[in-house]
């Protein structure tokens, strides 16, 4: 993380840490989540804390918070990269990757794919059965194949 990103995370942490104890407990996390428009249940709050709480203290300290934020920022960056790739396929800007889009990209990359192979690729990623690949389907398949 850059110094600026660390500073942003420190400011966010300090906002959550309402009593200034240097840690975020379940009550503080619930208040902050509600302020952000979420309504997490008590179990969800406990799970969030246990997922982040590496030392088993039952609270989140700044180091643990920073590790979580670093991971989240990494996810955001890879999502942006995947969406850039999606837009390269979706050259007609329909919000979907069609058979025609995929065939064009394969040809540009010098891949000699048959129409059947292209259709198989679409079928593999197409979760809603509309015959095209939307952003979520593309994101999912890219994550699944670990290309990002």
UniProtKB/Swiss-Prot annotation:
InterPro entries: CALM/Myosin/TropC-like (IPR050230), EF-hand-dom_pair (IPR011992), EF_Hand_1_Ca_BS (IPR018247), EF_hand_dom (IPR002048), RNA-helicase_DEAD-box_CS (IPR000629). Residues 4-39, 40-75, 77-112, 113-148 form the EF-hand domain. Gene3D superfamilies: EF-hand. It holds the Pfam family EF-hand_7. Ca(2+) 1 binds at residues 17, 19, 21, 23, 28. One of its GO terms (cellular component) is myosin II complex. PANTHER family: EF-HAND SUPERFAMILY PROTEIN (PTHR23048:SF59), MYOSIN LIGHT CHAIN 1, 3 (PTHR23048). Ubiquitous. One of its GO terms (biological process) is cell division. Ca(2+) 3 binds at residues 126, 128, 130, 132, 137. Keywords: Calcium, Cell cycle, Cell division, Metal-binding, Mitosis, Repeat. This is Caltractin. Ca(2+) 2 binds at residues 53, 55, 57, 59, 64. Belongs to the centrin family. SMART domains: EFh (SM00054). This calcium-binding protein is found in the basal body complexes (the functional homolog of the centrosome in animal cell). In mitotic cells it is specifically associated with the poles of the mitotic spindles at the sites of the duplicated basal body complexes. It comes from the Eukaryota. The keyword tRNA processing does not apply.
């Amino acid at each position: 993380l850059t110094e600026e990103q660390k500073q942003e995370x420190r400011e966010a942490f300090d906002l959550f840490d309402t009593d200034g104890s240097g840690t975020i407990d379940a009550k503080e996390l619930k208040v902050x989540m509600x302020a952000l428009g979420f309504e997490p249940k008590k179990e969800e709050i406990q799970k969030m804390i246990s997922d982040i709480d590496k030392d088993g203290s039952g609270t989140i300290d700044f180091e643990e918070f920073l590790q979580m934020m670093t991971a989240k920022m990494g996810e955001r960056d890879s999502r942006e990269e995947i969406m850039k790739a999606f837009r390269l396929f979706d050259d007609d800007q329909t919000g979907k990757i069609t058979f025609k889009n995929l065939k064009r990209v394969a040809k540009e990359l010098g891949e000699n794919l048959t129409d059947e192979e292209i259709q198989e690729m679409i079928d593999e990623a197409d979760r809603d059965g509309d015959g095209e690949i939307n952003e979520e389907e593309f994101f999912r398949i890219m994550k699944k194949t670990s290309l990002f």
